[in-house]
């Protein structure tokens, strides 16, 4: 079988579990070696690392806070030292909380925006020079449908993800004529650790609204990332693809 990412090197932030973990495993299944940048340790990342090995690919786990400039720089340096190049960057690392706006602390605003948006900036900032030099690369930023429609008591999270979508469009306009494609994914309600923070009442109400009548699974987002990382998406630039079960129809 012809693998879509054969011989490629991918960096996946937040790749130790959840959506990022599924993306990392799907990339390996399609022939890529994967650098996982995450705050979780090797024990927590073991299922993903084992799956990558089972696909016959190499992996590197680098403990990284994506909001920290020096840690991101060190992670990218480690990726180049191990693999020599970076073909694909997936910015999936993120954080989440809920708060009525009138009670939202400045420190919590800063924390969420720093991880979700500053982290995307930093990873792109340190990966992009190598891609520009080679005139080749794919950048995939994981946003959220709440960046498109907003979420109640989630102004900070929604703003950070809307920023990711805007960042994606602006960077795509700047670098697409240099062989680098930048796109985003805005998942809908996916069964991740973040969604586990929601109440049973919210879940029941949301399920009743969904055209498909069920929440999505992390593995259902991964094929979108494979598509955007491969040559199958050769004419996609600055787009936001939405695996959301029909929850939002644009």
Model regions and ranges:
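A conserved structural motif in NAD(P)-dependent oxidoreductases
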Residues: 210-221, 232
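Residue(s) in the substrate-gating loop at a strand-loop-helix junction
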Residues: 144
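Canonical Rossmann dinucleotide-binding motif of NAD(H)/NADP(H)-dependent dehydrogenases/reductases
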Residues: 5-35
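Active-site helix of classical SDR
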Residues: 124, 160, 168
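Substrate-binding pocket helix/loop in short-chain dehydrogenase/reductase
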Residues: 100-101, 108-113, 195, 202, ...
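Short C-terminal tail/terminal secondary-structure segment
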Residues: 149-152, 226, 237-250
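Catalytic Tyr-X3-Lys loop
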Residues: 95, 102-121, 136, 140, ...
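Alpha-helical segment proximal to the catalytic Tyr-Lys
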Residues: 129, 173-177, 234
């Amino acid at each position: 079988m012809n693998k879509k990412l054969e011989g490629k090197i991918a960096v996946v932030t937040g790749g130790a579990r959840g959506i990022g973990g599924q993306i990392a495993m799907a990339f390996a299944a399609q022939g890529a070696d994967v650098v996982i940048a995450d705050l979780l340790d090797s024990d927590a990342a073991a299922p993903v690392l084992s799956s990558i090995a089972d696909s016959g690919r190499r992996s590197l786990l680098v403990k990284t806070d994506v909001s920290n400039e020096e840690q991101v720089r060190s992670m990218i340096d480690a990726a180049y030292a191990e693999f020599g190049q970076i073909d694909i960057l997936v910015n999936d690392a993120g954080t989440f909380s809920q708060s009525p706006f009138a009670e939202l602390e400045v420190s919590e605003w800063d924390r969420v925006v720093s991880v979700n948006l500053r982290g995307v900036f930093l990873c792109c900032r340190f990966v992009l020079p190598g891609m520009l030099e080679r005139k080749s690369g794919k950048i995939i930023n994981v946003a959220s449908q709440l960046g498109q429609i907003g979420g109640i008591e989630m102004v900070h999270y929604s703003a950070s993800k809307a920023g990711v979508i805007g960042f994606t469009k602006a960077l795509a306009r700047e670098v697409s004529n240099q062989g680098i494609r930048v796109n985003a994914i805005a998942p809908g309600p996916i069964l991740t650790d973040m969604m586990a923070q929601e109440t049973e009442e919210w879940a029941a109400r949301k399920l009743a609204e969904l055209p498909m009548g069920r929440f999505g699974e992390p593995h259902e987002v991964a094929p979108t990332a494979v598509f955007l990382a491969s040559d199958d998406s050769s004419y996609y630039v600055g787009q936001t693809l939405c695996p959301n079960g029909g929850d939002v129809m644009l």
